[in-house]
Amino acid sequence: MRLISSLLLLVYSARLALSLNLTNQTAVLGYWGSNLAGKMGDRDQKRLSSYCQNTTYDAIILSSVIDFNVDGWPVYDFSNLCSDSDTFSGSELKKCPQIETDIQVCQENGIKVLLSIGGYNGNFSLNNDDDGTNFAFQVWNIFGSGEDSYRPFGKAVVDGFDLEVNKGTNTAYSAFAKRMLEIYASDPRRKYYISAAPTCMVPDHTLTKAISENSFDFLSIHTFNSSTGEGCSGSRNSTFDAWVEYAEDSAYNTNTSLFYGVVGHQNGSNGFISPKNLTRDLLNYKANSTLFGGVTIWDTSLAAMSYDNSSETFVEAIHKILDTKSKHSSSKSSHDSSQGLESTSSIALNPTSSISSTSSSSSTSSAISTISQDHTKTVTSVSDEPTTITASGATSVTTTTKTDFDTVTTTIVSTSTLISASDSTSIIVSSYVSTVTQPASTRVQTTTVSSISTSVKQPTASVASSSVSVPSSSSVQPQSSTPISSSSSASSPQSTLSTSSEVVSEVSSTLLSGSSAIPSTSSSTPSSSIISSPMTSVLSSSSSIPTSSSSDFSSSITTISSGISSSSIPSTFSSVSSILSSSTSSPSSTSLSISSSSTSSTFSSASTSSPSSISSSISSSSTILSSPTPSTSSLMISSSSIISGSSSILSSSISTIPISSSLSTYSSSVIPSSSTLVSSSSSLIVSSSPVASSSSSPIPSSSSLVSTYSASLSNITHSSLSLTAMSSSSAIPTSVNSSTLITASSSNTLLSSITSSSAIVSSTTVSNISSNLPSATASSQSQLTNSSTLATSLYLSSSSSRTISTSSTNEYNTSFHAPTVSSTTSSSSTTSLAANKGVNSNSITSLNLESTSSVTSTAYTTDSVTSTTALTSQGPSSSVVSSSLSSTTSLSTSIPVTSSVAPAVTSTGSETSSVVGSGTDSATSSSWTAETSSSAITSSVAASVTPTSSSSASSWSSSSEVDPSTAASATGSSTSSIATASVSGSSTSSVATASATDSSTSSIAAASVTGSSTSSVATASVTDSSTSSVATASATDSSTSSIAVASVTGSSTSSVATASATDSSTSSVATASITGSLSSSIATASVTGSPTSSVTAVSSTSSVEGTASSTIAAAASAATLSSDAASGSSTVTSSATASSSSSAATTADSSVTTDTPSNDFNANVDTAGLWYVSALSSYSVPAGFAWTTIDGFSVVMPSANAYKKRSLPIKATANPALNGAGTWKTIHTSATTTAA
């Protein structure tokens, strides 16, 4: 086995060595990707891997990248084998997954794959050195071994790049080659190639400078499509011979291999040369030029076609020519058709025994060419006992492979000698590999004779041991299912009344933590009530527990489907004639993470009550609807809408209560952390179902209803709430309390409605309060209490005016049928509004509104209404706005004995008061007036209503928080980077961030936020951009606060940083800064239309070698707006400070200090690119350097690469000699900077 492994390794090594040898004068290279045959109407080109299945080509060049820069990316075309529709997001860069796979197949078969830059149809042009260096870095990252997020060939890495260009400048392509070779040197793990395809003309106007200044591995000389007609046979300077002379005399690498470039079909291009006419030239160059490497064919699809009506393909004909021995060649074939190999080996083990082995192998073939490679391997071992063994042998292995094009015969001759004496053993193995490639049309016969040997075994004193450690791996897939069952039963004592009740409870849960399957069953059979709760639950290894259960018994049904850790439902019924129906439904979509090892359920019941039923279902993303409605002479409907994140809960319940019943109901729930439901009716109905969940979203809800009746009644209470807001999540705790006390027959109706929208207008209307009293003495009292808290945002316009309005309407209509009747109504409301949005914690605005009103109405007396309103607004620390508004409205009315109508009292929002009604009662001659008062307040008001005959209370609060953020970044691009992030129309807060980092040419980072009602933050930054940088941040139309920040850091040429905040009603901060820009910097910050406070900061710091710096800062801050609501005037007070500072070592010429040249001035300048100034203006400049002026100083620097900044830092080389003419000085920046 070891011998076979060694032989296979030798075969692979030989093949690899062949694939790396591009200078053996028989190599054939092919261009693939242009599909020239398909464009001529013939068969389309095959996929790349089909050309790598045999030894037809030693290397394949992908053709090609046809454009340098379209929207910042190179453009490439591989015809039918890379789809235009499959591109990387946000670019025109195409994905080529099939080519990725094929490149790896070719490389595994020992065939190198290069990428052509330009191509026959390329619109390619590099016009300056920057284009060349930057493009080299870009194609290395995209196609080579670099790191780029967009890689058309995925993980495949090409083996090099080929320049096939005819546009642009000589210096640009020289810069490209120079940078590429430097990058190659950074990855010594593998060999990368650089090649070019110049025209016949010497010099080539785009490539000769690159060839003379850089070491190219090989050149493919175009012998077609030239101005001289067929091939390179024109003038003296347009022949292949001219390129041989140029390579030997002028190329940087005088050993650069030259390939004869031909087109593969007569219809492919001008200058086609048939194989018959190529034979003489190719054999001549092969015999007489050591630089001749072989033939390059345009392209592989043409080369696979027959030519000039020949039966063979063009590439087959080329191989036949290159494999022919030239009569001028002094080399000899290492194998011919009649030669056989024979070897005899003998091993002497001791004086009396021997082993002899004879093996021979003969092979007959039409050998056209032989490539041989010698391998010698020596292995030395040590044995414990002295042993002398001498053995020798030869083995010949012949392998023949037949393909569509060629027959390949490989013969491996292995000779081994074993010499062992005393304590050392030597094994010498010599292998000879002979490979013959022959066209398919030649018949090859191969005969192999295996060796026959006899042996006598003799034990020796040699001890050999081997140990092989094979690691093992195992995969265990655990599966477990552990059921845990629990059961409970409930019993009931004797019931006084025969009742029926139905309890339905459904809880659906999915547990994401694996524990166990939990079935639970309980049953109870009281006299007339049965409660049963079977619980089933399944737990699989994937930690999902679906549960379901159902039970149906005589009078009561309880169904529970739950994955909860504990559940208890005790209930007791007493003798009442009431039915409570409560239903709660919610859509399921709940994931609960519960860590519990056991489940317990307890149900107990003692029922002496009339029928009662409860059904409930609770889940995390749920809707709970609850509305209790007493039906016998009393009806109450309550609805509330609750929005919290992705959770919506609506609850409703309906109750029907007879006259003589007493019902007390209390319900509270907290979802999703825990949920508890408690109900009671005279005797107690208590239900508890806690649910544990991994999410945290508390939504408390409680309600209670207490009613007492001693006579028949008709009572209707309606409360509705409508909220329209721009928030995406809200949490609304809700409570309702209602009590009714009636001592006589009466009918009362109270209507309370609250509407809230983004304009936040609230109204409260109380109407139609009437009493029909059969007796002479009666009284009615009604109390209205409103209390609400709303967390929202205020709209404060840019002109410093507040558009805050509120309106309320109270209507009182009372009819009396007895002479002694009194009616009293009082109302009070408190509203607080707070906004706290954005990243600025100081951006807090609160609004407190208090209103108190009372109405007293008595027969023959005066009614009065009093209303007081107070407004307080608290803004950021730099701005405090306080306003208090109050109004009092009084109403006096003379009421007849039988009826009284009080005119409407309206509060509407104009900050003025006027009499809107007046009159005189005819019976009493008393006069009455009504006033209208208003205040500039916009608020959200929630109402609590308590009528005379029944009382109820409801309150709600809403809080919302939205934080949409958008971020974009671009990192490490050698050419240009553009990062843009924007947010539009966000009602609460917006954050847009854009950054560009380490871009060598240009960077643009822009961030913008538009139309955000609460707060906006826009940030744009550019870091280490070598040529130009633009950072722009803007925040527009933000009603509360805006922050715009733009910064540029470390830009060597020019920088622009702009930040602006526009029309922000509360506070704005705009900051622009530039740091370390060598040439020019512009920093601009502006704030427009901010009525409260504005801060504009502009800072610029520039330093070179730390000897001079300047800082300019300007700010407008501490702006305060105070307004007088009564007079409608406002005052803005602001203060501004500006400061500047600068420092410098010295001024004018004294800013040059005497020290030796150093290489720490700028680590990113080009090679030998340090900047120095000479003390003597008449100093003679060394070769390769030139005078220039920087910051007013005369400077000597390398002339070729002056003022160049590289993407990758390169340490400067040694400083030029002064030749005794003067002393070098290190440059510093100018001395004085004046603050603007």
Curated annotation (Swiss-Prot):
Keywords: Glycoprotein, Glycosidase, Hydrolase, Secreted, Signal. InterPro entries: Cts1-like, Glyco_hydro18_cat, Glycoside_hydrolase_SF, Glycosyl_Hydrlase18_Chitinase. Residues 339-351, 810-821 have a biased composition (Polar residues). GO terms for molecular function: chitinase activity. Coiled coil: none annotated. Its EC number is 3.2.1.-. This is Chitinase-like protein PB1E7.04c. It comes from Schizosaccharomyces pombe (strain 972 / ATCC 24843) (Fission yeast).
